[in-house]
Amino acid sequence: MKLFNQLRWFFVREWKRYLGAILLLIIIATLQLLPPKIVGVLIDLIIKKNMHGVQILPWILIIFLVAVIVYILRYLWRILLFGASYQLATELRVKFYTYLSQQSQIFFLKNRTGDLIARATNDVDRVVFAAGEGVLTLVDSLVMGFSVLIVMSTQISFLLTIISLIPMPIMAILIKKYGKELHETFRHAQISFSLLNNQTQEILTSIRMIRAFGLEKNQSNKFNIITRNTGKKNMEVAKIDARFDPVIYLSVAFSNLLAIIGGGWLVWNNQISIGQLTSFIMYLGLMIWPMLALAWMFNIVERGSAAWDRIHSIINKKLYIEDGKNNIPPYPGILNINIKKFYYPNNQKPSLKDIRILIKPGNTLGICGPTGSGKSTLLMLIQRQFNFKKEEIHYHSLSLLEIKIDDWRRRIAVVNQTSFLFSDTISNNISLGKPNASQKEIEEVAKLADVHKDIIDLPERYETQVGERGVMLSGGQKQRVCIARALLLNAEILILDDALSAVDAQTENNILKNINEWKKKKHSLIITTHRLSALINSDEIIVIKSGSIIQRGNHLKLIQEKNWYKSMYYYQQSEIELEDNEKTGEKNL
């Protein structure tokens, strides 16, 4: 029942629908009390020979009309009640998605995709079912049950009613006990379902790697274990679920037995008539549904409550990244970075320390360094993926923490290390951030990203479907489509996080040349790369090692000093020369 209190905000808002449904249920319950009463009266009249066959027909017609009216009214209350519950499903999923879209990187490191999908689908369905069928069964069982009890006790026999209800307290105690067991067992079953979702998602997204390494059997065994465990958990739920109906039917059977014995004694002593006893037995039959409904309601609500706890545990968490209140002036500004120390959550060792950078509009900053040195961490801080101290990063003399996140992210365009494309056309993937872009604009940025020629060679050109995660394109093509997508945003700051790793040196040179022409003193460029040739034209290059800047300057300055940059640059150049010599030798052969 706690769930209904937790959803009170929705019930209060949709009170008209729920009130309408409840009123219709009361009318239905009242109408359903008529047939047993009519049957009892008819039996007494027939026994007394005060009624003939033809006189019965109008009463039968009344019973038929009652059934038709009840059918129509049930249709109407279902529209009212389930219309409201479906609205709840929409709102919960939108709320869940909105919350996820506002979360930072750290949230998704702690919560797996499959589990989040399970909460947004299966758990929401359970909550909605409780808000629909749960409310229905609660109201229907209470209204019908109390109506029947009142008629039985006032119109027939109060004593017989008390005798017949002797098994009910025992049934109520057992149902409450099973309900508590069901809540905990169902919660474990949902956790197991989340694990199954996680495993399925991992297998489907990494199917190429699984096949490449011949891990099909290994992954199949792991999936089989998780599937069996999920089935086992659901079987435990089913076993508890299966206890409800037998308890109810045994209680009803025992109530009928007591009613027949007690009713027979009352008829023998002329305290009630045979017709009244018949009506009483029919009313007792009407009590089967309220009791079943009450047990079913406990079942539904306990499942819904367990599901709500799982949903609420996500959406009730405080956002790790809090939004600012200020808007940015509508023109490019200076990005000032002064990070003394940055620690990842629950990490004692600083990932960045003493990082001081000034990026003016139109400037290019190159970032390089060994793997794991902190380059991507710095870029994530610029994107506000993690929290930092108020004074550490400023834009337009405003701390990034004071700027509205949406406004800031509209000013930056990011191409990450891992290229991500949606299962859509190339055109729609490029125009993702600017849906109203013209075909001319799309083609212009594709040319800047040096991918236009590749696209027009495809059968359907820009309308080619790229498949799941861009599976129909090569790694280099995916990177270039992502670069085109970022360029179309025309953002003040363009960030390329090792976004040219899958293209050859000539293509890289073409793209950087086009980007340098595109930015023309209006846009800033931040580029991280392991291929140092991409940084030659940067206004400033910083070398990060173990989270600190160990060298800085432009390309000409850094190659004149004995340092990491110089040795790595000439090492890479020698590799390129060696590859060129090998290609030349192959041609001569």
Curated annotation (Swiss-Prot):
GO-annotated molecular function: ABC-type oligopeptide transporter activity; ABC-type xenobiotic transporter activity; ATP binding; ATP hydrolysis activity
Main location: membrane
One of the record's GO cellular component terms: plasma membrane
Catalytic activity: ATP + H2O + xenobioticSide 1 = ADP + phosphate + xenobioticSide 2
Family designation: Belongs to the ABC transporter superfamily. Drug exporter-2 (TC 3.A.1.117) family.
UniProt xrefs under NCBIfam families: PRK10789.1
Annotated membrane topology: Multi-pass membrane protein
Keyword set, alphabetical order: ATP-binding, Cell membrane, Membrane, Nucleotide-binding, Translocase, Transmembrane, Transmembrane helix, Transport
ABC transmembrane type-1 domain residues: 18-303
SUPFAM superfamilies assigned: ABC transporter transmembrane region, P-loop containing nucleoside triphosphate hydrolases
UniProt subcellular location: Cell membrane
Key word Ion transport present: no
EC id: 7.6.2.2
SMART domains: AAA (SM00382)
Domain named ABC transporter: residues: 334-571
Transmembrane segments: 23-43, 53-73, 134-154, 155-175, 247-267, 280-300
Record's protein name: Multidrug resistance-like ATP-binding protein MdlA
Binding of ATP, residues: 369-376
Highest taxon, organism lineage: Bacteria
